[in-house]
């Protein structure tokens, strides 16, 4: 609002906190997200260094997470991540705003959450128990049959169907961690043409579908951040009139390595994702 005024993207709002039992999808304030991806960590580091040299006086970084590629695109729980990502035209249809909000067409909504995993408890489970929680085979990455898959499986609850058709999002999750500090996690990054799709996934996970039939993965994973951003198109940014930024602005910064294709088999992760906030309180 400080930079661009009105109108704003139609569905941009504060990330909606969810509480149910001991499960809590926290909402953490932030204003700007830099999601940086490259095959080379040094390039990520250099770009974020230059960004912060330019805006550091106007922003306060509130989180910076360094992610990496783990084996064949697996998370630290041992399962392949992003298997169901759409490709090509389907990915564009899933992620990009179109005629429903013409002023912001070509942009996307992104929800980010930082999850910490209790690896000691997770590793106590048998492989079969882990597979029932995730809804797919651990080694082969094959989805469990409907007969074998519990209704509380992670991939069952995060499947959204509208008018008989599955609604996809584009994920670019990153594993991260500090083994020496006992920190193991997943940085969830989900792009969608509407935040409602991911919000419904989170309600299914944290509250349950039906209520009480929640995602058992949350018995081992805890969300410590949660923020919704709008990502403007390159055309939108090119059309922005350059000028001096407001001195009251706080910005979020994020680093993460990348390739041009975030599809699970082709992307490469290995950088950092940092997030910061605008320095003035009482803004949106």
Regions found by a protein language model. Name each.
Residues 1-276, 281-283:
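Long, histidine/aromatic-enriched segments associated with O2/redox biology
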């Amino acid at each position: 609002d400080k930079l661009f005024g009105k109108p704003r993207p139609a569905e941009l709002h504060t990330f909606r906190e969810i509480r149910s039992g001991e499960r809590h999808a926290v909402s953490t304030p932030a204003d700007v997200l830099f999601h940086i991806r490259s095959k080379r960590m040094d390039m990520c580091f250099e770009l974020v260094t230059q960004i912060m040299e330019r805006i550091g006086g106007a922003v306060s970084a509130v989180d910076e997470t360094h992610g990496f590629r783990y084996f064949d695109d697996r998370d630290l729980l041992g399962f392949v991540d992003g298997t169901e990502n759409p490709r090509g035209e389907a990915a564009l249809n899933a992620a990009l705003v179109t005629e429903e909000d013409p002023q912001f067409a070509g942009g996307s909504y992104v929800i980010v959450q930082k999850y910490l995993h209790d690896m000691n408890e997770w590793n106590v489970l048998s492989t079969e128990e882990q597979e029932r929680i995730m809804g797919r085979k651990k080694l082969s990455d094959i989805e469990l049959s409907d007969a074998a898959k519990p209704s509380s499986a992670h991939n069952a609850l995060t499947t959204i169907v509208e008018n008989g058709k599955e609604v996809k999002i584009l994920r670019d999750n990153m594993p991260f961690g500090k083994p020496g500090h006992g920190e193991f996690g997943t940085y969830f990054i989900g792009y969608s043409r509407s935040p409602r799709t991911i919000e419904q996934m989170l309600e299914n996970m944290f509250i349950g579908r039906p209520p009480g039939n929640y995602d058992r993965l949350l018995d081992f994973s805890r969300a410590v951040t949660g923020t919704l951003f709008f990502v403007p198109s390159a055309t939108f940014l090119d059309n922005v009139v350059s000028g001096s930024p407001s001195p009251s602005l706080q910005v979020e910064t994020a680093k993460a390595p990348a390739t041009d294709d975030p599809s699970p088999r082709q992307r490469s992760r290995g950088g950092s994702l940092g997030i910061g906030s605008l320095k003035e309180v009482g803004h949106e």
